Every structure is written in structure tokens, then in C-alpha cells.
UniProtKB/Swiss-Prot annotation:
Domain of life, per lineage: Eukaryota
Protein name: Oxaloacetate tautomerase fahd-1, mitochondrial
Function noted in UniProt: Tautomerase that converts enol-oxaloacetate, a strong inhibitor of succinate dehydrogenase, to the physiological keto form of oxaloacetate.
Enzyme class: isomerase
A molecular function GO annotation: metal ion binding
Subcellular location: Mitochondrion
Record-level GO BP terms: oxaloacetate metabolic process
Binding site for Mg(2+): 65, 67, 96
Family: Belongs to the FAH family.
Disruption phenotype: Reduced brood size, impaired egg-laying behavior and a severe locomotion deficit, characterized by a reduced frequency of body bends, reduced exploratory movements and reduced performance in an endurance exercise test. Cells show increased expression of enzymes involved in serotonin biosynthesis.
Length: 214
């Protein structure tokens, strides 16, 4: 499992789950989903501490979304909920950076969200925590601070779809490879970020990352 500390170099994709916290869905005026909503970021989305967050060209409304990430430890295809936790090697925390103006335009046109979600650098990501450090991923606290002030803070027990459900559903449609990351959704509190902002995020008492916005 220790080899998964370098999961960013192993990953083939980042699977993201939309609207998995009721309060976030409602703050954007969206319906509560009846099944998981999935989209994918490319691995070029990853950036690490020391690299700046940069809005894509033309974006005027860039939002942050803090999310618990699940790191896959072995190839997973059409797995069951009862076995799903056996495919997890550890956890991380990331920001799903979203060009909200791009996304709003795509929604109106009935088009995919790809440009809004998967631009280069759209996934600032923290370090790796082995499963032994998080015995219950549904009982940790996500946080995100902007310029030192709380912007998002929520426990993971209020997810609409829990992690086994997400992994079972995802792997019915496509295979998860070793090192792939599944981002499990964001709570309420997303907001526009600006050049010069400092974003700090992580899991309370477990993991902390800090990024500057260019």
C-alpha cells in the first residue's frame, strides 16, 4: 500500500461525483440526484503544493469545491458494495476547481461540463493517507479556508451516496485502475475565488494543504 503514496503518477483518471451533498445541490438550485452523477477529469488536472491555481482562459467565475478522495489499490470492475472497501488503498483531499460560468453555459446548452471541470490544473490535491489512518471515511471532517476564513466545513457522514455505493455504481460502467482517484462530492460553501487568494483545505487533524491563486 505504501507505493500508493505516489498515486498521482499511477492514476489514469480522476472520477468525480456531482451533487453528493444535499446542501451543495440546493445552494446551486439543483435537484437532489436519485443516482450518482459522474464526470471525469484528466490526470493533467493534478497540481500539488507549490504550483499555483490558474483559471482557464476566459473564465470569470472560478469556484473551489473541497472533496474527500478515494485512492484505488487494485483494478476494480463491476464490484459489489460488500467488497468495495477492499479496493481502497487510502485517501486524499482535493479541490474540484470549477469554471462556474463555463458550467452554467454548458447546462443551458445541454452540453457536457468537460471544459468547466477538466482544464489543466483543475485538481489541486493533497497528500496520501493510508486506510489505517482513516478507519471510517464516513466520519471525518472536510474543511476549506480562503484567506484564513472558513468557507466549507462538513462531516462526510452526510453524503447522499456512501463510498461503497459510489464504487459499485462507477465500476458497472468503467474500470478503475490502481492509483485512480474518486472524488466523492463537495458540501455547501462554494464561492468565487480571486487572484491573490490563499486556499487551505484538508481533513481536520489529519491532512492539510495550501495553494495560492494566480
Amino acid at each position: 500500500m505504501s507505493s500508493l503514496a505516489g498515486f498521482r503518477n499511477l492514476a489514469t483518471k480522476i472520477v468525480c461525483v456531482g451533487r453528493n451533498y444535499k446542501d451543495h445541490a440546493l445552494e446551486l438550485g439543483n435537484a437532489i440526484p436519485k443516482k450518482p452523477m459522474l464526470f471525469v477529469k484528466t490526470v493533467n488536472s493534478f497540481i500539488v503544493e507549490g504550483e499555483p491555481i490558474v483559471a482557464p482562459p476566459g473564465c470569470q467565475n472560478l469556484h473551489q469545491e473541497v472533496e474527500l478522495g478515494v485512492v484505488i489499490s487494485k483494478k476494480a470492475s463491476r464490484i459489489s458494495k460488500s467488497d468495495a472497501m477492499d479496493y481502497i488503498g487510502g485517501y486524499t483531499v482535493a479541490l474540484d476547481m470549477t469554471a462556474r460560468d463555463f458550467q452554467d453555459e454548458a447546462k443551458k446548452a445541454g452540453a457536457p461540463w468537460f471544459l468547466a471541470k477538466s482544464f489543466d490544473g483543475s485538481c489541486p490535491i493533497g497528500g496520501f493517507l493510508p486506510v489505517s489512518d482513516i478507519p471510517n471515511p464516513h466520519d471525518v471532517e472536510l474543511f476549506c479556508k480562503i484567506n484564513g476564513k472558513d468557507q466549507q466545513r462538513c462531516r462526510t457522514d452526510v453524503m447522499i451516496f456512501d463510498i461503497p455505493t459510489l464504487l459499485e455504481y462507477t465500476t458497472q460502467f468503467f474500470t478503475l485502475e490502481v492509483g485512480d482517484v474518486v472524488l466523492t462530492g463537495t458540501p455547501a460553501g462554494v464561492t468565487k475565488i480571486n487572484s491573490g487568494d490563499v486556499i487551505e483545505f484538508g481533513l481536520t487533524d489529519k491532512l492539510n494543504s495550501k495553494f495560492n491563486v494566480q
